[in-house]
Amino acid sequence: MSDWMPIAKEYDPLKAGSIDGTDEDPHDRAVWRAMLARYVPNKGVTGDPLLTLFVARLNSQTKEEKLKEVFSRYGDIRRLRLVRDLVTGFSKGYAFIEYKEERALLKAYRDADGLVIDQHEIFVDYELERTLRGWIPRRLGGGLGGKKESGQLRFGGRDRPFRKPINLPVVKNEPHREGKRERRERSRSRDRHWDPRPRERDHDRGREKHWQDRARVWPENDWEREREFRDERAKTRDKRDRSK
């Protein structure tokens, strides 16, 4: 358990389909599809993936100008792409923002997640398609996050990190009671996504204020990801230099 991390370092469709990353069999057809899929990142995508953020849950009315206004607060932007439908031209609700400097990227990653833009609370993460080994997109049954209503939640990302597996010690005097409690906890863990706030607060706060009171999910792990990000970036730069 010492090597356990709430954020996946490598994408595994089977683990992503499990709230604690311990499933041994796929629980839905989408996971099967992702396990069988072979995905190659789009080589036509330009820009440095290690300086690019993924911004999602945008209002369909939010324009490029608004995103540039908000995200330029953290540093100079090199490239901004709001993804649109090729036929209708309407926004698909997500964008990619490339910064000129790593410092700006990290600041935006820490501070922009959860901001409200045009009445929508946005989600911010690093680009994963070109940086997370083994990545499988949502359309092939993979991805991360998702809505509970869809029945296809994917764990191991910033939005829905893995929950630490439950390993409760067995009490010799009360073996049956302990076993029932463990089963109850495991059953509950399948039905809800983990929230770091104390449970009693959930009853005291309205859903409309969730974005204001939300605690950062595993903030200490964000710092770990930043260190890993810098190490990976250095390795990538070295490979590029050697290939020249």
Curated annotation (Swiss-Prot):
Domain RRM: 51-129
GO terms for cellular component: nucleus; U12-type spliceosomal complex
Record-level GO BP terms: mRNA splicing, via spliceosome
Cell compartments where the protein resides: Nucleus
Segments for region (Disordered): 146-244
Record InterPro entries: Nucleotide-bd_a/b_plait_sf, RBD_domain_sf, RRM_dom, snRNP35_RRM, U1_U11-U12_snRNP_70-35kDa
Cross-link (Glycyl lysine isopeptide (Lys-Gly) (interchain with G-Cter in SUMO2)): K172
Pfam families (alphabetical): RRM_1
Main location: nucleus
Bias (Basic and acidic residues) ranges: 146-162, 173-185, 192-244
Highest rank taxon of the organism: Eukaryota
Keywords: Isopeptide bond, mRNA processing, mRNA splicing, Nucleus, RNA-binding, Spliceosome, Ubl conjugation
A GO molecular-function annotation: snRNA binding
Keyword Nucleus belongs to the record: yes
Subunit structure and binding partners: Component of the U11/U12 snRNPs that are part of the U12-type spliceosome.
Full protein name: U11/U12 small nuclear ribonucleoprotein 35 kDa protein
Lineage: Eukaryota, Metazoa, Chordata, Craniata, Vertebrata
